[in-house]
Amino acid sequence: MSVRPTEITEILKQQIEQYGSRMVVTNVGYVVQVGDGIATVHGLRDVMASELVEFENGVLGIAFNLQEDSVGVIILGDYTGIEEGDEVRATGRIASVPVGPALVGRVVNALGEPIDGKGPINTDKFRPIERIAPGVVMRQDVDTALQTGIKAIDSMIPIGRGQRELIIGDRQTGKTAIAIDTIINQKGKGVICIYVAIGQKRAQVAQTVATLERYGAMEHTIVVAATASDPAALQYIAPYAGCAMGEEIMESGGHALIVYDDLSKHAWAYRQVSLLMRRPPGREAYPGDIFYLHSRLLERAARLRDDLGGGTLTALPIVETQANDVSAYIPTNVISITDGQIYLEPDLFYAGIRPAINVGLSVSRVGGAAQIRAMRQVAGRLRLELAQFRELAAFAQFAAELDPATKRQIDRGLRLTEVLKQPQYEPMPVEEQVAIIWVATNGYLDDVLVEHVREFEKQYLDYLRTSHPQILQRIASERELKDDLIQQLHEVTRAFKQSIWAPPQERVII
């Protein structure tokens, strides 16, 4: 059998035509120095700011400092397995997290990886953790209430969907409790909640998740946890990861609530990373861009225009103060960024006034626009009565005898303060809040002993639910107190006091 030269030529031609000379260019560098969760890498020539890089052992990092001859990388994982001389590859992408409905009910870390032992998250949608906030023309006014279920907040410091409301106070004053109650109260209201735990103990995060599960709130909640034992880099990116998950809901036309617990520890993590990277320190050793760290995060909360879906992302950042000092660096920064603050005081907390909200220093810059009309009708008088009470209470300490009008005002204030107390994990529907605040501001509690006010409230609301549910239904549906409804409330309240109300009997010891 002879091989003809023409056949050989034909085969060679086919081989040459089929050959594809594809060049794969990979941006590679080498670790020069590593330690304390950061690495200095030499040779990553075309790396982008905040680009993800991958180390030889599979651990990821973020290009944080871009210098002339090296790149400072923050390591998103265990840095103990990384050694000098290890290869580092640029991935060509910015840090992203999985987003979408599959995350609801799950506990994930700052990279969106599940840590609850319930298996993988089935989603093919990812979003970059850093994103420019919606512009002015993309937004619309905040005018829809986000009900927290907490009487003191919904009446005097209303929060709207798309607002940023700071919760600020010393440690152990009930900041997280307010946020958790708000999440529990969103059940059945079509709001997806994201709870971002930054720098907390793992046991504390587990306890929070257990509480949310006990009250059925995990069905509409995503928990993003970057605990105290996680690297500072993960604590730094955790809020941005949670925000990306919330933005997906907002841009899909849905409503999301995100709690950052807390931004003080977030600032500490960023300060730690920045100092290790040799960035110049400023006030309180924070880097110069610490304001931008929080402003670019909180500005992403918005209410979008209707033609963009009308979705909302509401932010409740938490900041811890030291010895009531709201003039420190981080508190003043976040106060200036947000649309109001809820200020919690240790003195009120230890006096048994819980939630320990100082309504004089707390404010919501959205105001009554985010309240239903019925709540606005009762809240105005409540605010005025409490303001007068605070003024007179300070004056009364120095007065030997009080005139009847002043004493009456102080007694009313004491009862209003008692009405605003509320146990933890018991958020109240807005129609019940309106009813009990109306009763208090219209003088029906003036002859009830202060220590019996809570029992009166319990019995009165039980009476409305069982005997007059139509009143609560009308408040909920009509969203205002019309004249005939007010008349009905007067009649029902008088009837309750005459025939139903039974004050607790004092125990007689023989």
From Swiss-Prot:
**According to its UniProt record, which reaction does this protein catalyse?**
ATP + H2O + 4 H(+)(in) = ADP + phosphate + 5 H(+)(out)
One GO cellular-component annotation of the UniProt record comes to: plasma membrane
User: Which PROSITE patterns has this protein been placed in?
Assistant: ATPASE_ALPHA_BETA
Q: Which domain of life is it from?
A: Bacteria
Leading EC class: translocase
Residues that bind ATP: G169, D170, R171, Q172, T173, G174, K175, T176
Q: Which key words are in the record? A: ATP synthesis, ATP-binding, Cell membrane, CF(1), Hydrogen ion transport, Ion transport, Membrane, Nucleotide-binding, Translocase, Transport
**SUPFAM superfamilies linked:** C-terminal domain of alpha and beta subunits of F1 ATP synthase, N-terminal domain of alpha and beta subunits of F1 ATP synthase, P-loop containing nucleoside triphosphate hydrolases
EC number(s) per entry: 7.1.2.2
Record NCBIfam families: atpA, PRK13343.1
State what this protein does: Produces ATP from ADP in the presence of a proton gradient across the membrane. The alpha chain is a regulatory subunit.
Stored PANTHER family: ATP SYNTHASE SUBUNIT ALPHA, MITOCHONDRIAL (PTHR48082:SF2)
Family the entry assigns: Belongs to the ATPase alpha/beta chains family.
Q: How does it assemble?
A: F-type ATPases have 2 components, CF(1) - the catalytic core - and CF(0) - the membrane proton channel. CF(1) has five subunits: alpha(3), beta(3), gamma(1), delta(1), epsilon(1). CF(0) has three main subunits: a(1), b(2) and c(9-12). The alpha and beta chains form an alternating ring which encloses part of the gamma chain. CF(1) is attached to CF(0) by a central stalk formed by the gamma and epsilon chains, while a peripheral stalk is formed by the delta and b chains.
Protein's recorded name: ATP synthase subunit alpha
Gene expressing this chain: atpA
